[in-house]
Amino acid sequence: MKIGLYLSAHKTEVFSQQCESNEKPIIRELELDEAQTELEKLKTDILNNWMPNSDECEDVWGKKIITTSLLIDGVEGHIQTQKQLRDSKNFSGTEHKYTAFFMGSSMIAMAEWYENYNSYRYDTRGITIENIFSHPGVKGAGSILMEYMVNTSENLGELGVICVDALEEAIKAYEQLGFKMDEYSSSQMTLTPSDSEGKWYKNKESEWKFISK
């Protein structure tokens, strides 16, 4: 497991102190209230310690942080909507789930996803990750969380297949993980680990593992 910190961050020392822990990294599914709480903590940390200065907003680092903040806002909105729908007696629709990656007590990455069979993509194998992001000061967490999600798909009987609707700036990163663009699409991508030679393999425990380079 390879996790590192970007040394070019504004306040790297603050986050490194939070993340350096003897506790084993944990990835687990969160209930809506806990997911909302953890997102708020992550957003507060980013706003207080990581937001770029006005002259940095257009560089790669600034765009990464701003994109992460916008994704968090979007996911928070989804959670609020789901909570309202669940309070309705006539609730029906896609059930989103939230899987988070923790180092010690700090959440460093999250995936918002749903099972395709229970959505408008019911005729498509796999699970769909609607949003996935990591703390802007951490590198390597996203691919580790994706590995976990591939095995989640496998355990659900979906052969490890993952679907995403990729942001343009994220397409290359998804390709490095083995995703391929769907036919007739410019953003919808699918990962089939069994067809991603040189990127994925199954270990002795029949778990999918990503071949990091």
Place the predicted regions along the sequence by residue.
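Non-catalytic substrate-recognition and accessory regions of acyl/acetyltransferase enzymes
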Residues: 2-137, 148-161, 165, 169-213
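Glycine-rich phosphate-binding loop
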Residues: 138-144
